[in-house]
Every structure is written in C-alpha cells, then in structure tokens.
Amino acid sequence: MTKTLPPVTVIGGGLAGTEAAWQIAQAGVPVTLYEMRPVQKSPAHHTADLAELVCSNSFGAASSDRAAGLLHEELRRLQSVIISTADQHRVPAGGALAVDRGVFSQDLTQKLAEHPLVTFRREPLDQIPSEGITVLATGPLTTAALATELQQFTGLEYMSFFDAASPIIVGESINQDIAFLASRYDKGEAAYLNCPMDPAQYQAFRAALCEAEQAELKDFELETAKFFEGCLPIEELARRGEDTMRFGPLKPVGLFDARLGDFRAPENKGKRPYAVVQLRQEDKQGQLWNMVGFQTNLRWGEQKRVFRMIPGLENAEFVRMGVMHRNTFLNSPELLEATLQFKKRPTLLAAGQLIGTEGYTAAAAGGWLAGTNAARLAQGLTPLTLPETTMMGALFEFIHSASPKHFQPMPPNFGIIPPLAERVRSKKERYGVYRDRSLTDLEQWREESCRPAALV
C-alpha cells in the first residue's frame, strides 16, 4: 500500500519539520523533506544538520508538574522522535532537559536520512506545492520568496515579520485589591484590569524603565526593527519624555475604580489615578492577562524586576515575557483549524514557530500533530485533535481560538489549560493535578483515537 501513496511534502528541517517528517514516515506514508541548508544559508544557523538548536541547548523544565515538562511527557508517550533523541543525548542541567546540541542534531539527521520512506532534498523550495499534502514548517526565518508566497496565499494582514509582544501574566497572581475591572469612561463591558499609579509611583517606574538593561538585537533583526516606529518599546516611550507614557499606553483618562465611588463626583477628583497600566484578557477562561502596550526589548530579568513595581503586579507570574525580534508567524486563529490544517485548503498544514507557538518543545509538538494529520489525510482518515486538558491540546486550541485581533505567539503554560472542577489552592499541588488529568486523558484518547500503527 505504501508504494501507491503519493509522498507528503514537508518544507523545513527544523524541530517541527523533522518531527513531522518522522511521524509521516512512521505511519507508513512516504515523505519528501526539503531543507535549504547548506545550499542557502540562514543568518541564525551554523550547520546543515536537521533540528539545529540555534539558541539555548535546553528544552525547559524537566519535571512533569511544570508546563514544559508536562509537554515533554506527553510527547514521550506519543513517541516523539525529538524528545526521545533529546532523552538519549541529555546532559546535566539541574532541573532542565538539556542536550549535547551537536550530537542531538547529527543523530536526528542520520535517523531521517536512513529511514526508507524519507526522501531528503537539500534545496530551497520557494513555492507552496499546488497539489498534494504539504506541511509548512519554515520557522521564524522563512525565506523572503516563500514568505511572499505565503502572503499571497493567506493575505498580507494575516502574516507578521517582527514579533513585538507584551508580557502575559497569570490572572490569579494579580492583586485585585489594587487592580480594578473597568473600561474607559465605563463604555461597553468592563474588559480590562487596571493598575493605577500616583505621581510618585509613576516617576519611580519611569526612572527604572529608563535605566533597565536591554537585550541586544541580532544583526539580521536590526534592519527589520528600523521599520517598527509604530510599535515602540515601552522603555523608549519612557525615555522620550516625562509624560509620553501617560499620553500613550498609560493614559488614565476615563478610568476610575468604582469601589471608590462615582468618578464624576467633584469630591473624588483627587482619587483619580495619575497613570494606569491596562491588562487585557488573553484567553476564554480569563486566566491570562496581557499588559497592553508593553512591548519591550528589556532583558527578561529586568522585565520582572521593573514590571513588578506596578501597583497590583508585585507578585506577578509571567507566562510570556515581552519580546521584540524577527519572527515570521501566521495569524493562526484566522487561518488554521485546531488540527493545524489551513481552513481554506485542508491538505496544507503548518507547524512550529510559524503557527505562533514558542519554544523548542512546542515546535516538536506542532510537528507531531501536523505530521500525524498529514499521514492520516494521505490514508483517507479523519484528522485528529487532542484533548484540551492536555498541554498539547490546550496549546493548539489556543492558537485556533484566540482573538485574531490581538494574537501573539504563546509558549506552553498552565494558564491555557481548562480550570479544574474544584479549586486547588496550592500552586504545586494544582499543577500536579493538571498533570495527572492530562496524562490520564491522553492515554484514554490514544486508545479511542485508533491511530494507525506504523507500516514499516
């Protein structure tokens, strides 16, 4: 049967593309994997190996009661080639899953090259194939030619080329004795949490922003950043003048804590905030909140230090830090199903950072699902979605159902998982219950989904 099936095409040999190609081949479906290196070089890569780790050698926390660790364990149970190879080449790193990155990538390259159903093409592919089943896994440094092709396919407004994202905070870590729920001038639904500042708090915050240490943009990001004047980092606004932030994202006009009375009453004039940091709901459950207008290029440690100076955010737990860097990604809620198929063309799938997930393990998870579903499409089977109670299922449901207007790339985190039926106060215990529920539901799903066994 395998000889009669046309090959699936996978474009991109990073973590997502490598995982996708492996899952397709392991399901007994031939696959052609395109990787442009070394014929065409990338500004971030140093080798021609598959799944090269271009930043850290760490896949994040290893413990399964942490978000990254739970995703590792889910992928282990789903026979991910990325995670099994990472386990094989693990190096000491405290509580993290870290690898010998050179040996890790070389081993994966060899595994794919030796698989009888994988055809490895080292050449750029600058057009999306018009026929057949294809997985796009070209990553944040997608070539200009293929990016243009994607723009034509998706529409210009549905692609981003520079990621300027604000931090995202766990809702329960926000002090709501200080933060208040309101919309400006009480218009519409009270959709924002607001953190008020008095003059002294504002001046101290501005001074800390101006002095905080910034991350360095890489050489290949500098040119893109020049065109980003319309979305300036918060620290640049702070440097431009004492009141620049107060007339921008920290504008206090029309925002008042109703618990203090009627904001229109003359006796309450002195209670009106001098500046306000707004937080916008990021997910359906209201467990995650985005700091509006706080795109930043500060180092992550500095972000935590400075942003915790904001009243109400003293104990803020960040699930994503603010970033400003080169990152080609799709507006996935507008374009993709939770199966990672394009809505307008179900035989085209996408995975990795291109779909708006963050991190090595999330890229592998996207490759697993896109590859599995590409193989199922080739075999005439219905594509799968994972339970939302799993980290994988929650992540892909988020990128499918988040607000298209405010979509930002998202890393694995417990804030996107549906809440428990009964509240568990201890965070450590709660994350352990999330883990137990996830792995139980994953095992049941595996039994019921009847995923076809490998044919090779």
From Swiss-Prot:
Chief location: cytoplasm
Cofactor(s), by name: FAD
Listed as disulfide-bonded, the cysteine pairs are: none
Q: Does the keyword Repressor apply?
A: no
> Under which main EC class is this enzyme filed?
transferase
Keywords (A to Z) from UniProt: Cytoplasm, FAD, Flavoprotein, Methyltransferase, NAD, NADP, Transferase, tRNA processing
Q: Which reaction does it catalyse?
A: uridine(54) in tRNA + (6R)-5,10-methylene-5,6,7,8-tetrahydrofolate + NADH + H(+) = 5-methyluridine(54) in tRNA + (6S)-5,6,7,8-tetrahydrofolate + NAD(+); uridine(54) in tRNA + (6R)-5,10-methylene-5,6,7,8-tetrahydrofolate + NADPH + H(+) = 5-methyluridine(54) in tRNA + (6S)-5,6,7,8-tetrahydrofolate + NADP(+)
Biological process, per Gene Ontology: tRNA methylation; tRNA wobble uridine modification
Q: Where does FAD bind?
A: 12-17
Is the Hydrolase keyword given for this protein? Answer: no
Localization in the cell: Cytoplasm
Spell out the molecular function terms from Gene Ontology: flavin adenine dinucleotide binding; tRNA (uracil(54)-C5)-methyltransferase activity, 5,10-methylenetetrahydrofolate-dependent
List the record's Gene Ontology CC terms alphabetically.
cytosol
Q: What is its EC number?
A: 2.1.1.74
Classification via PANTHER family:
GLUCOSE INHIBITED DIVISION PROTEIN A (PTHR11806), METHYLENETETRAHYDROFOLATE--TRNA-(URACIL-5-)-METHYLTRANSFERASE TRMFO (PTHR11806:SF2)
Family under the similarity heading: Belongs to the MnmG family. TrmFO subfamily.
General function of this protein: Catalyzes the folate-dependent formation of 5-methyl-uridine at position 54 (M-5-U54) in all tRNAs.
Q: Output this protein's name.
A: Methylenetetrahydrofolate--tRNA-(uracil-5-)-methyltransferase TrmFO
Q: What is the lineage of its organism?
A: Bacteria, Bacillati, Cyanobacteriota, Cyanophyceae, Oscillatoriophycideae
The protein's gene is named trmFO
